[in-house]
Amino acid sequence: CLFFLPASAQKKDKCNETEFRAKKQAYMAKKAHLTQEETEKFFPLYFEFQDKKKEINKGAWGNAKKGIKPETSEEQYEEIIDNYFDEQERIARLEKEYIKRYREILSNKKIYMLYWAEIKFSRNMLKILQEIDDTKNKGL
């Protein structure tokens, strides 16, 4: 996966979702100091939540793409925006449900540390993708 490769090797490695999740899991578990047992119990729930969130977002993006068309009306933009925030509320409710389930496995401190690790992982991925984009734009 991109996150774990030097810039020169990134183009050669196409990371599939399973590999990406494994690396994300390892990174987050390490940063949150999870035990093997905690890791085995937590991450199936975490990825279950991620899958549900992905499905909700897929619907939101489908609606948002309608706004790309130049003939989109103000009423349609209003609907797109309202749908987007409805989807975000659905995700927030779902996440609260999963937090309750996480608390059956982990302390609040470890849940916090996992969320922080997830943010750092995402930021690192964005930096790497930006570096790749910058390299492509320089013609290298």
Which ranges hold each PLM region?
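Small-side-chain structural scaffolding
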Residues: 7-9, 32, 39, 117
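Amphipathic, charged alpha-helical segments and their helix-to-coil junctions
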Residues: 48, 92, 96-140
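Bacterial Sec-dependent N-terminal signal peptides
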Residues: 1-15
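Short N-terminal segments immediately surrounding and downstream of signal-peptide cleavage
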Residues: 11-28
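Amphipathic alpha-helical segments
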Residues: 24, 28-105
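Residues in flexible loops and secondary-structure boundaries
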Residues: 3, 36, 40-42, 114, ...
